[in-house]
Amino acid sequence: LLRLIVCLTTHKARVMKIDLSGKVALVTASTAGIGFAIAKGLAASGAEVVVNGRSERSVNEAIARLQNEVPGARPRAAVADLSGGEGVAQLLQAVNGVDILVNNAGIYGPLDFYDTDDAIWENYWQTNVMSGVRLSRALLPAMVQKGWGRVVFISSESARNIPADMIHYGVTKTAQLSL
């Protein structure tokens, strides 16, 4: 799906059109980077995209950019920090069900293994793994009941080839491959 969405947003001459009209897509951490590209591709395919980020400003800027780059896009805002259960609960209240869930939220950065304490490990685990687990657990039953839905976890090459200076990150990305 990610490869297809990137194609939708970068190769206008040979676009494969997927009609997602009437579908609601939540893309976590979608104010920039990969998340924004995914949101843009889904919006270009007709989905109503829920843009998520940690600050109202970044979400509003991403929505404005999305509306500018995808004529007819109808994005919605969902401001929430997904590094803990409270932020996930806040996001769930804002979305009221979706057809497509793209678990893109994640943090990364190089850290020395010996200096990475339990609190740092826990923060990476909660943000990179548990945010997606919590959202999937809450949103997937309605998809199953409707008979249609998609859940995607965005992982990384670091899941299979864990960098020595980002073991804490690589482990969380490996966990995502199992979900």
Please provide the spans of the model-predicted regions.
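Catalytic Tyr-X3-Lys loop
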Residues: 99, 107, 114-133, 148, ...
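Flexible N-terminal pre-Rossmann segment of NAD(P)-dependent oxidoreductases
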Residues: 9-26
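A short, exposed helix-loop element centered on a Lys and neighboring polar residues
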Residues: 136-137
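Conserved glycine-rich cofactor-binding loop
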Residues: 24, 31-32
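Active-site loop immediately N-terminal to the catalytic Tyr-X3-Lys motif
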Residues: 40, 114, 163-167
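Residue(s) in the substrate-gating loop at a strand-loop-helix junction
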Residues: 156
